[in-house]
Every structure is written in C-alpha cells, then in structure tokens.
Swiss-Prot record:
PROSITE patterns membership: PPIC_PPIASE_1, PPIC_PPIASE_2
Protein name: Probable parvulin-type peptidyl-prolyl cis-trans isomerase
Region Disordered, residue ranges: 158-178
InterPro entries named among the record's database cross-references: PPIase_dom_sf, PPIase_PpiC, PPIase_PpiC_CS, PrsA_foldase
Extent of the signal sequence: 1-19
Organism: Bordetella bronchiseptica (strain ATCC BAA-588 / NCTC 13252 / RB50)
Enzyme Commission number, as recorded: 5.2.1.8
SUPFAM superfamilies reported for this sequence: FKBP-like
GO function terms (MF aspect): peptidyl-prolyl cis-trans isomerase activity
Length: 258
C-alpha cells in the first residue's frame, strides 16, 4: 500500500470531462481512464494486474482525493513551502518525461555499443592485473620487523598477516587482496605493485595514508577483457547517460542564461 501511495503522489493525469467515473469524492470524479493509467504505472513497477489490485488502487485514489480536498479547504495547498514542493515535483516529472522521450527518439544503436566496446578494449590492451597480498601496520618499525621475517621465510607471510595486519578485510585471508589492476590501489601502493614481478616482495615498507604496508605480488596476468554481450547493459546505460549529457549541454547553449 505504501508503494502505491507514493506512486499516487507523483501521478498527475489529465482526463476528459466525459470519461466514465469509477468514484466521486464530494463531486470530484475519479475516472476509469485515470484508474487504468495508474494501474498501468503500478504494473510497470512489477505488480500483476488483477481485480484486487484495481480495487486497492481505487481506494488509494479515493484516499488521496480526500486528503487533497482537505488540504485545499484548510489552505495548506497555498502555503509557500508546499507550492515550492509542488513546483519541484512538477519539474521533476517533466524532466523525466522529456528525457524518456528524447531517449526514445535517439536510441543507443548497436554500432555505438560496438564502437564504445572496441574503444575501451583498446584502452585496456596490454594492461596487467596483480594478485597481491599485504600486511598493514601503523608504524615503520613494525613494518620493517615483519618484512625481515617474511624475507627470511616467505611462508610466514600468511600467519604474520593474520596476526598483525590492521586491514580487517584481508587479514583473515593472510593478507590476500585478490586479483585487481594496480589502478585499484592508492599511490604509492600501486606504484610499488607495478614494479614487482611474480613472487617478489618489496625491498622496504610502503607508506600510504592508511599506514605502512609490507607488499608481495603472488602472480600477474594480462587483463582479460569481457565479451561484448557481458558488458552490453553497462555500455548501453553509459551511452544513454552520454546522450542525455550532450542533450543537456545543447539545451544550455541554446538557452539565455544570465
């Protein structure tokens, strides 16, 4: 019911005077057309059209009309802050409708998706990702002590990370951060990672804003770019946002803004 109530607040539907009414509230009609449109809206959100749903929506529309009439009678509707909210809601509805209409008239094409895919794939070509583990501590001395222990016996890394690392996310996994490109990490952590080869350990602890790190690269591999179908939804959404951004820029350039 709450979900339907929220939709009702945003649902403004103009109907002809001759439309068939499903109810009246103090002479104010609730038309069959407005009910049908409201049902269509709710069904588009995942509900199933049924007599029970239609009755529920009708009762909610009646409740809304009762409250609206009370607000108008008591003068609430004329309050400045209420008028501001109404205007903002109206603007929001118009903006969303305009964007939807523009995207319908300017849909993302397969050619655009393919071009964007190839562009990103080319940008990622030759890039590496790293399987990294680290031990994070608060001071340099502790980091140096731990680094010395690992250098003497790399098999100790797992236990030392579990016992000493301040990174709760990786400590329980022996410091393992999993596979990721170096760009996922802060500098100078990322810089240290890219300088290490498979199985190598840093020569000295690395300091970041989080503390001091003992870093080891367990493995490296080229970034495996996903097939286009796997990322198509994300590419389409990105292109839609670009389309809207360009449309907004165009409208602003045409507008007289002072």
């Amino acid at each position: 019911m709450k979900r339907i109530a929220m939709l009702a607040a945003a649902c403004v539907i103009a109907v002809p005077a001759f439309a068939q009414n499903v109810a009246t509230v103090n002479g104010k009609p609730i038309t069959q057309k407005s009910l049908d449109e409201f049902v269509k809206l709710v069904v588009s959100q995942g509900a199933t059209d049924s007599p029970q749903l239609r009755e529920q929506i009708k009762q909610e529309m009646i409740n809304r009309q009762v409250f609206v009439q009370a607000a108008e009678k008591d003068g609430v509707a004329k309050q400045a802050d209420v008028q501001t909210e109404i205007e903002l809601a109206r603007q929001g509805i118009l903006v969303r409708a305009l964007m939807a209409d523009y995207l319908q008239k300017h849909p993302v094409t397969d050619a655009q998706v393919k071009a964007e895919y190839e562009k990103i794939k080319k940008e990622q070509a030759g890039k590496m990702e790293y399987k990294v583990r680290h031990i994070l501590v608060e001071d340099e001395k502790t980091a140096n002590d731990l680094l010395a222990q690992v250098k003497s016996n790399k098999s100790k890394f797992d236990d030392l990370a579990k016992k000493n690392s301040k990174d709760p996310g990786s400590a329980e996994r022996g410091g393992d951060l999993g596979w990721a490109p170096a760009t996922n990490y802060v500098q100078p952590f990322a810089e240290a990672v890219t300088k290490l080869k498979k199985g190598q350990l840093v020569d000295k602890p690395v300091q970041t804003q989080f503390g001091w790190h003992v870093i080891q690269v367990d493995d490296t591999r080229p970034v495996e770019f996903p097939a286009m179908d796997q990322v198509r939804p994300q590419l389409e959404e990105m292109l839609r946002q670009q389309t809207l951004a360009n449309y907004q820029k165009q409208l602003r350039e045409q507008a007289k803004i002072q």
